[in-house]
């Protein structure tokens, strides 16, 4: 039987608090460090590896973390989730994003249908539509092929799909699977939509409107912006727009769209990249086969997350170490540092994934918790970040755990040799150097040049960013966040924190304000 308990009530957590702290500088020095790098490593799916040698752990800490995983019933809770139990307690909903890429357990029926069948049917419909667009069977009003796809959405309807598109754009061009350029409109700031519309040929563009409810203010505002641009160009908007929405939304059967593809209430926006939300734009941009490879990579990583052995379950181990850093060592934030320009927007997606899921101060029963929960997530690609905020990471007063991601090979495979090394070798040399520099530091009599070290990090290493490895990387972090939510006894699948601002904004627009809200509204000339 599964029990849901706060982290600070677990016996194994109290034992973890009493385990002797690791001196990371000493642990990573010399041959000790070399042995840790060899031994503290867990295989992931699709050729990826999670290496935690530079984390502030040793065998004693790891043994305590394994006990915590057992007592917190992490794999049992994951099993309950993928077998269709109501895990989103706040909204009384199932949590089924894993089922968009595979079936990990029992068949799950909801709304009178088998959910795995529902998701695969939507994927098949999207694939058929995308293939017809690419073949010129579905065209604009003049019978001409579409060349650009524009996604209109916000939050999870934008951040994840945008990050995945950018991650695979150059790979697709190199591998001759690039079909259409993709653009994204998300912000209600009119300059966002105007800039995108000014950069494309609207006559040859197809727009994907993404709104589960069909009532999202920002998205519908931007849809009107786009429809106005199409009308001004003498075009029929209904020949240029498709919808990704729920079957019960007002968009589902509207004549305003070429086609509608469906999601449901069991997939949160930040977990929706492997659903129709990501499927439509990625299939149009790169072809359905590429999206299928992306799903396969995610499914393979999901399968690893079922393993009860924490040392064969990279997402669970990553989650446990993160909770140790947050709740025992007291570190307030985590930097995500991919050494790949392809992953330029991946930190922004992970920021939403993590902070919207676990940025909670009450447990799944609505009771206040007495311990820190989700960390602040931020990051930029390397080596750019080294010349930006790494100064604070190396010598600041806060210790910030680091999550590196690095690849042995570039996507474009175009490179030059300068000073006896390629650009890719320089990139990889920098990430290796940073891990050791953060961990070991460097003593100097000049205090301004002294590096204390003891800055923990992990790295996920792969051969190349491709559809399958990207899917595995995404699933790793989704499952890490899930496991941490289980440990903190949170509901990681709602986001009430976004609601209050929306309510107040509607009051401002209706001029129903007083006090500070009225004064701020007047200052902004609303």
Residue spans for each PLM region:
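Short, solvent-exposed amphipathic alpha-helical segments in soluble enzyme
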Residues: 164-169, 198-202, 224-226, 350-358, ...
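Basic, glycine-rich polyanion-binding accessory segments appended to enzymes
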Residues: 410, 457-471
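Glycine-rich phosphate-binding loops that contact phosphosugars or nucleotide phosphates
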Residues: 128-136, 142-308, 507-510
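C-terminal structured subdomain/cap of oxidoreductase catalytic cores
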Residues: 449, 465-517
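Extended, charge-enriched "interface" segments that sit outside catalytic cores
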Residues: 4-142, 420-428, 439-440, 462, ...
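Acidic, Ser/Thr-rich peripheral helices and adjacent loops at domain boundaries
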Residues: 413-449
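Active-site phosphate/pyrophosphate-binding segments
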Residues: 229-414, 453, 500-526
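Short glycine-rich or small-residue beta-strand-to-loop segments that form or flank ligand, phosphate
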Residues: 147-155, 207-213, 333-340, 377, ...
């Amino acid at each position: 039987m599964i029990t849901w308990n706060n982290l600070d009530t677990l016996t194994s957590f109290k034992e973890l608090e009493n385990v002797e702290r690791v001196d990371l500088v000493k642990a990573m020095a010399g041959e000790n460090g070399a042995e840790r790098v060899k031994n503290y490593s867990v295989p992931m799916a699709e050729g990826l590896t999670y290496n935690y040698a530079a984390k502030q752990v040793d065998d004693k800490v790891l043994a305590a973390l394994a006990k915590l995983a057992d007592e917190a019933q992490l794999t049992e809770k994951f099993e309950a989730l993928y077998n269709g139990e109501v895990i989103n307690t706040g909204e009384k909903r199932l949590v089924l994003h894993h089922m968009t890429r595979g079936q990990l357990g029992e068949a799950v029926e909801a709304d009178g249908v088998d959910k795995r069948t529902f998701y695969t049917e939507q994927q098949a419909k999207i694939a058929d539509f995308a293939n017809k667009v690419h073949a010129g069977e579905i065209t604009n009003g003049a019978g001409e092929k579409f060349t650009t796809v524009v996604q209109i959405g916000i939050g999870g309807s934008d951040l994840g799909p945008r990050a995945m598109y950018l991650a695979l754009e150059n790979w697709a061009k190199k591998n001759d699977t690039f079909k259409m350029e993709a653009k994204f409109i998300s912000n209600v700031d009119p300059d966002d939509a105007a800039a995108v519309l000014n950069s494309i040929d609207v006559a040859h563009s197809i727009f994907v409107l993404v709104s589960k409810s069909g009532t999202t203010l920002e998205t519908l505002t931007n849809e009107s912006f786009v429809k106005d641009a199409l009308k001004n160009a003498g075009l029929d908007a209904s020949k240029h727009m498709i919808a990704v929405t729920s079957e019960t939304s007002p968009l589902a059967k509207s004549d305003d769209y070429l086609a509608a593809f469906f999601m449901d209430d069991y997939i949160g926006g930040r977990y929706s990249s492997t659903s129709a939300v990501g499927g439509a734009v990625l299939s149009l941009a790169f072809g359905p086969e590429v999206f299928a490879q992306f799903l396969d990579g995610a499914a393979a990583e999901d399968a690893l997350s079922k393993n009860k052995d924490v040392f064969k379950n990279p997402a669970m181990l990553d989650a446990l170490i993160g909770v140790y850093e947050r709740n025992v060592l007291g570190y307030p934030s985590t930097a995500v540092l991919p050494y790949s320009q392809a992953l330029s927007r991946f930190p922004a997606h992970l920021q939403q994934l993590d902070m919207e899921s676990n940025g909670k101060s009450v447990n799944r029963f609505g009771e206040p918790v007495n311990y820190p929960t989700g960390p602040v997530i931020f990051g930029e690609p390397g080596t750019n970040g080294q010349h930006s905020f790494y100064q604070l990471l190396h010598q600041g007063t806060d210790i910030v755990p680091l999550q590196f991601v690095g690849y042995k090979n570039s996507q474009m495979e175009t490179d030059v040799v300068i000073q006896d090394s390629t650009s890719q070798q320089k990139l990889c040399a920098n990430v290796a150097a940073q891990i050791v520099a953060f961990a070991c530091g460097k003593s100097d009599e000049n205090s301004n040049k002294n590096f204390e070290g003891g800055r923990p990090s992990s790295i996920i290493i792969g051969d190349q960013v491709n559809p399958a490895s990207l899917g595995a990387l995404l699933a790793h972090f989704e499952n890490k966040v899930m496991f941490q939510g289980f440990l903190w006894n949170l509901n990681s699948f709602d986001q009430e924190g976004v609601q209050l601002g929306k309510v107040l904004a509607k009051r401002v627009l209706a001029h129903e304000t007083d006090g500070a809200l009225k004064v701020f509204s007047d200052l902004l000339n609303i």
